[in-house]
Amino acid sequence: MVRVFLLYNLFNSFLLCLVPKKLRVFFPPSWYIDDKNPPPPDESETESPVDLKRVFQMFDKNGDGRITKEELNDSLENLGIFMPDKDLIQMIQKMDANGDGCVDINEFESLYGSIVEEKEEGDMRDAFNVFDQDGDGFITVEELNSVMTSLGLKQGKTLECCKEMIMQVDEDGDGRVNYKEFLQMMKSGDFSNRS
């Protein structure tokens, strides 16, 4: 569960920085997660190079180490976000520090660093609300299972698996993840005992 939340948070932060406010939605990067090459279990930083690279690769479709306007457009369209060409150009320019018309991994990492510094409580609440489907302030086993299943993730396909994921972050032992637990998990750097 922690790994899914971390990748989700990285991807979501990137989209929040780029997509105009009226079009902002929250999408998990589940369809890009490579189960064959998982990151080492002892990673403890939310913005680890492995996770940042995975998010970058979501947009770098041809794997050349650069995100072009076309690749950004394709990725956003796959998420149901359709942007005018002029907005796509502005998005690339916002990230393109060296002026080559593309975004490389270093520019992406710099952008993410600034996003992390400016993270707002509202963004975290919106991310939490994706999983808290009934709006009662808790992520239950059933809600987690519903989200994980709808995303087509291998992790969390069974209620038992989701229960185990909940237990990993449930600090008060009530069998659910409340917003405080979610926020602490996302903002703390101590994921080594939960991964």
Curated annotation (Swiss-Prot):
Binding site for Ca(2+) 4: D170, D172, D174, R176, E181
Gene Ontology MF term list: calcium ion binding
Name recorded for this polypeptide: Calmodulin-like protein 4
Family: Belongs to the calmodulin family.
Entry GO CC: endomembrane system; endosome membrane
Organism field: Arabidopsis thaliana
Signal peptide start-end: none
InterPro entries registered for this protein in UniProt: EF-hand-dom_pair, EF_Hand_1_Ca_BS, EF_hand_dom, EF_hand_pair_protein_CML-like
Positions annotated to bind Ca(2+) 2: D96, N98, D100, C102, E107
Limits of the EF-hand domain: 47-82, 83-118, 119-154, 157-192
Matching PANTHER family: EF-HAND CALCIUM-BINDING DOMAIN CONTAINING PROTEIN (PTHR10891)
Entry keyword Calcium: yes
Gene name in the database record: CML4
Function: Potential calcium sensor.
Keyword entries, A-Z: Calcium, Metal-binding, Repeat
SUPFAM superfamilies attached to this UniProt entry: EF-hand
Xref: Gene3D superfamilies: EF-hand
